[in-house]
């Protein structure tokens, strides 16, 4: 199992507009301590939207 203090934890990215959780990725906590936002394709919307890290 992963440690709670893992440097590269798994995070889930959810679409800001439709709230669907579309992507799972990893991030480096030292470089990005805040929640990350990426512009990715949302299959439900059919276009690129902002996806924000969920907890």
Swiss-Prot record:
Which domain of life does the protein's organism represent? Bacteria
Q: Does the keyword Zinc apply?
A: no
For this protein, the record's Gene3D superfamilies field holds: Ribosomal protein L33
Q: Name one GO cellular component term.
A: ribonucleoprotein complex
| GO molecular-function terms, A-Z | structural constituent of ribosome
Which keywords are on file for this protein?
A: Ribonucleoprotein, Ribosomal protein
S-adenosyl-L-methionine: is it a keyword of this entry?
no
Q: Which InterPro entries match?
A: Ribosomal_bL33, Ribosomal_bL33_CS, Ribosomal_bL33_sf, Ribosomal_zn-bd
Q: Which GO terms describe its biological process?
A: translation
Record Pfam families: Ribosomal_L33 (PF00471)
| Entry-linked NCBIfam families | PRK00504.1, PRK00595.1, rpmG_bact
Q: Which PANTHER family would you find in this protein's record? A: 50S RIBOSOMAL PROTEIN L33, CHLOROPLASTIC (PTHR43168), LARGE RIBOSOMAL SUBUNIT PROTEIN BL33C (PTHR43168:SF2)
Family note = Belongs to the bacterial ribosomal protein bL33 family.
Q: What is this protein called?
A: Large ribosomal subunit protein bL33B
Q: Which gene encodes it?
A: rpmG2
């Amino acid at each position: 199992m992963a440690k709670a203090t893992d440097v590269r934890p798994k995070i889930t990215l959810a679409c800001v507009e439709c709230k669907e959780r579309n992507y799972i990725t990893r991030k480096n906590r030292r470089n990005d301590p805040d929640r990350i936002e990426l512009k990715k394709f949302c299959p439900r919307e059919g276009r690129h939207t902002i996806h924000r890290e969920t907890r």
